[in-house]
């Protein structure tokens, strides 16, 4: 135990008490038996333990609420994550507070401060600044300050953030996708959607290039088209692509929403999917199933992702050991939007 930073949870485990009991001793709360107090103080002295804000705050009464920040709940990716998290939270007697930031930094800062003022027991963030390659410095500082007072879990890599992280591993799902496309006879791939300052998008592009390289194939820069992560973005990008009179063989959409925009543009231009162009996507949300044709899509395993984030929070609050960084694998769901050539 001496090889790592000692936490209030380590003290609680060794003393055989709850983290809240340790916090009461640290704050000189009278509601602790003398026998427990002496035992805890001896362990604190043994490790020369210096409590931080999180250790002290555990002695306060729980609000049984968890705040969750997402960019836009209208995106089925984020709504699915929220619903799955809420289902787990309810099993442990917690309520969820949903905050939509609309991908706006000032809104993220405001929501984060408001959640702290409401004394929520933990905070989850998915998307937004947590996905940026260069997140806002002020926001990172605020996240780190918050993480010293309460459990903070982000559903991504979030550079610079000193909190718990659960991110999606892109390589496995992309490998399945490329193997499938190659088996269908496709070799020239276009990637549509996103921007190169967003970590999940960068990881997808890296994974795609790596997987193609294994088959001695390349992804030329002109085959990567940036656009917004929504239906309008996919529609505009596909219009641009079709107007270039260079009909693609297969398109990988960065998410299902972009794929829906691509479908809309193709329908207007009398381009048939998959007869003329194969189309595959990422996320495997309800959009994949209601699309015509139904979309082959890489599943982000959102249920597992959500459960890991919630279990991390419950473990921290309960004083159980948990990994600082966890990952979730992706897998391919094959439907009707890809043809054999």
Annotated model-derived regions:
Residues 239-341:
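Flexible loop/turn connectors
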Residues 71-80, 99-107, 129-133, 165-176, ...:
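Hinge/beta->alpha junction and helix N-cap segments in small-molecule ligand-binding domains
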């Amino acid at each position: 135990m001496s090889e790592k930073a000692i936490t209030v949870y380590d003290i609680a485990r060794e003393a055989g008490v709850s983290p809240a009991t340790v916090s009461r001793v640290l704050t000189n709360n009278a509601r602790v038996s003398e026998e427990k107090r002496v035992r805890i103080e001896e362990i604190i002295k043994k490790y020369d333990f210096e409590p931080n804000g999180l250790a002290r705050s555990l002695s306060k009464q729980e609000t049984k609420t968890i705040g969750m920040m997402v960019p836009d709940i209208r995106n089925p990716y984020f709504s699915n994550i929220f619903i799955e998290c809420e289902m787990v939270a309810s099993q442990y007697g917690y309520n969820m507070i949903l905050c939509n930031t609309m991908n706006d930094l000032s809104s993220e800062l405001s929501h984060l401060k408001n959640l702290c003022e409401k004394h929520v027991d933990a905070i989850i963030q998915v998307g937004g600044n947590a996905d940026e390659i260069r997140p806002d410095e002020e926001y990172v500082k605020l996240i780190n300050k918050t993480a010293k007072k309460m459990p903070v879990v982000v559903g991504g890599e979030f550079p610079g953030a000193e909190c718990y992280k659960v991110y999606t591993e892109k390589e496995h799902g992309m490998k399945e996708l490329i193997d499938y496309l190659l088996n269908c006879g496709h070799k020239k791939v276009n990637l549509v959607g996103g921007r190169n300052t967003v970590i999940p998008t960068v990881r997808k592009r890296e994974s795609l290039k790596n997987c193609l390289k294994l088959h001695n194939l390349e992804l030329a820069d002109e085959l990567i088209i940036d656009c917004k992560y929504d239906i309008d973005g996919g529609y505009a990008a596909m219009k641009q692509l079709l107007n270039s009179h260079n009909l693609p063989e297969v398109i990988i959409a960065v998410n299902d929403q972009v794929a829906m925009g691509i479908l809309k543009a193709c329908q207007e231009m009398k381009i048939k999917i998959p007869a003329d162009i194969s189309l595959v996507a990422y996320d495997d949300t309800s959009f994949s199933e209601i699309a015509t044709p139904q979309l082959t899509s890489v599943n982000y395993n959102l249920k597992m992702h959500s459960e890991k984030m919630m279990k991390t929070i419950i473990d921290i609050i309960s004083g159980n050991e948990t990994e600082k960084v966890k990952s979730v694998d992706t897998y391919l769901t094959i439907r009707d939007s890809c043809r054999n050539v």
